[in-house]
Amino acid sequence: MKTKKLLYIGCLMAASLVTFSSCGDFLDEDPKGQLTPEKFFLTEADLTASVNALYERINQTQSWTNPMYPQWQGDDITANPGSNKQACAALDAFASEGANKGVTDAWNLHYSVIKAANLIVNGAGNVNGSQEKKNVAFGNAHYWRAYSYFYLVRVFGKIPIITNTDINQLDAQPAEIAEVYEMIVKDLKDAINELPTKYDYEPARLFDVDVWVTKQAAQSTLAAVYMSMAGYPLNKGTEYYKLAAEQAKDVIDNNRTYGFILNPDWKDVYSMGNNYNKETLLGINNDAKGWWDHDSQLSSCCRFESLGDGGWGDAWGEIAFWKRYPEGPRKNAIYAKRITFQDGTVITADCNWWDIPTEDLWVPITMKTDAKELEKQIKGLDEKIEKEKDSEKKTVRKVNGKYEKLLFEKGKKCVKEYHPMFTIFTVNCDEKGGMLRQPYDCMKPNYSGMVNDRRHNLIRYSEVLLWYAESAARAGLDLSEAKYYLKLVRQRAVNSADVDKVTLSDGSIVNIDNMNAAQLAEACYIEHGWEVAGNWVSMVTRRADELRMNELKKNFEYRVTNAPVVIAKEGDKEYTAQESVTVTGPWSEDRIYCPYPTTDGEKNPNLKH
């Protein structure tokens, strides 16, 4: 009952924040009605409610795909150039405008988190309560403010720094990137000093995992931040890689206390049957109570639109990245090994994503069970058969009293999208369409409910191991442990014969034990890309890695050329494929970052381009 009361108070507070989603929205705020720290923070219950409200804001940064669209710039993800996917396709092509819904939502929703965090930072000290409870509130606020600025600075570059609830601050000039990072580091250091390593009460801990952020998660984040500062655009180099290694190593060295693991089977990493697992070091919890607040709406995002089960097709796998991807359990868990077609809850056919049939394939049509619906269905099918009677191209037929539809047409692509398909967020269903909590199997029927309670993996323990290994190599530290951690990550991910052999970017295959520091650093960088491929909710996505290594230009130039990729061979026949989203024009550094949202530029002249 106490938890429900606190959640209710938190929801009331969250409601007060909904109106002011973005930096610019504050400019329309009436000061007389403003929720201030002095008005809200009175009791310890207010502290918990404020953190609940903060997490309500955090959930919305990832509930649906829009705020994550900037991650489509990475070389792992691409988009449908048509349908209703123009927003993510524009970002995939490094050609977004300020009115793009992905740009607007990324900006608005992360600044909404910042506002909620600022309210806590500026007000929690007013509570007459225990310092421990106040520290928890401060720590969560400092952490998620840092996290939000970390997201924004990598997506937009220079951004306004807003640290309090004073509306006079909200026409601020965008701060330099270095200044934003200085604030991020300070907030994370504060969070590390304020946060516990474990919670023992609800709602901070649920399902045997810490829902609220912990000290070790803040340390891991600081390691990632230092790595970003070491690379592009600040290029602080060796010193900051050493700082990153220190933070990551401290988490690793204390893991006997924390209990993080690498799931033995890679299929369990994203499994709904393993939703609250011990590999996730930082997650965002969700439930499925309704739309647009704290559910996960990603379960239909990976399935292609053409497959018959209501897939949204928001993210397609980039072809060249998929082709380079090491074979093994990890690839089979991230990509569909076969593409299935579905009618209701029945799989009607399957194929490789590149297959082109040599003859037509007809499949049975699933008939309705309700008498009235069946009568209507039969009437519609008969009318279609009659309409196509004199046409060379028929799509429906009746054979021995059974209705069939043309699924694959001779000489035409079986899968219209003609791309690899991710399975990270996809879930299986039972015969009635209900969601199954088990590792995803690409050959079984797919859940089409669209909303579920998936816990989003922002940081996994495998990433911390790789961050340490790469940073140690780039900082000139001892390589023995770094090599061990790289092998540890690969042991469950790739085929056993390939664990010790890594293909580097120049195509050379190097045994891990024989690697020098530069080769090991590159191997770990590449490996992290395989680990987070297609997982656009990761704190450090493939796009973020490419930004740090200043390789987005390389990705852009490859996409402009768009040379055909040989994806499979069958005897003398070669199958080739090209990317569908067109990327054109010359490269310039400003293509790296998204433009400021148009609406915010109208309110704050300092955000005009």
Predicted regions and their residues:
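Bacterial Sec-type N-terminal signal peptides, specifically the leucine/valine-rich hydrophobic h-region
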Residues: L17-F20
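Conserved, well-structured interaction surfaces
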Residues: E44-W64, G82-F156, L170-E182, L188-P203, ...
